[in-house]
Amino acid sequence: MAGSELRAELEQRLGALAIRTEVVEHPEVFTIEEMMPHIQHLKGAHSKNLFLKDKKKKNYWLVTVLHDRQINLNDLGKQLGVGSGNLRFADETAMLEKLKVGQGCATPLSLFCDDGDVKFVLDSAFLEGGHEKVYFHPMTNAATMGLSPEDFLIFVKATGHDPIILNFD
């Protein structure tokens, strides 16, 4: 399924849950540094997303944190119970297979594509930071979609995922 079809399916799913969104179209971006000039005017929590696997390639995690967080994979591995040194970045092939998005497009909004293989880790600051909106790519890195933190959680749970909420402060 093409990115535009996946985005349309995402928008349909959000609509079915009565979730209102705000979308900003922008040039394709592959890094936070490239993205921020296009969306820094949007008030709220902007995301950085990491698609990770364990050393044995048996488990996958999508980790969503505030865009300016630095993540230590060893510390995160300990928090997730897989041990220090056991988390790795998953390759694009695995991300395409599990979440139907490629490099630069990792997003928790793609969790509706997952068959239950991916665990979702969410920075608690998205829910506890008093943000009016939280922002993610809508299946493409040429747009950014904002929704309320409450609606975001409703969407995530509707995909069958119970987020692992961690404090990254």
From Swiss-Prot:
<comment type="similarity">
    <text>Belongs to the PRORSD1 family.</text>
</comment>
<dbReference type="GO" id="GO:0002161">
    <property type="term" value="F:aminoacyl-tRNA deacylase activity"/>
</dbReference>
<dbReference type="InterPro" id="IPR040285">
    <property type="entry name" value="ProX/PRXD1"/>
</dbReference>
<dbReference type="InterPro" id="IPR036754">
    <property type="entry name" value="YbaK/aa-tRNA-synt-asso_dom_sf"/>
</dbReference>
<dbReference type="InterPro" id="IPR007214">
    <property type="entry name" value="YbaK/aa-tRNA-synth-assoc-dom"/>
</dbReference>
<dbReference type="Pfam" id="PF04073">
    <property type="entry name" value="tRNA_edit"/>
</dbReference>
<protein>
    <recommendedName>
        <fullName>Prolyl-tRNA synthetase associated domain-containing protein 1</fullName>
    </recommendedName>
</protein>
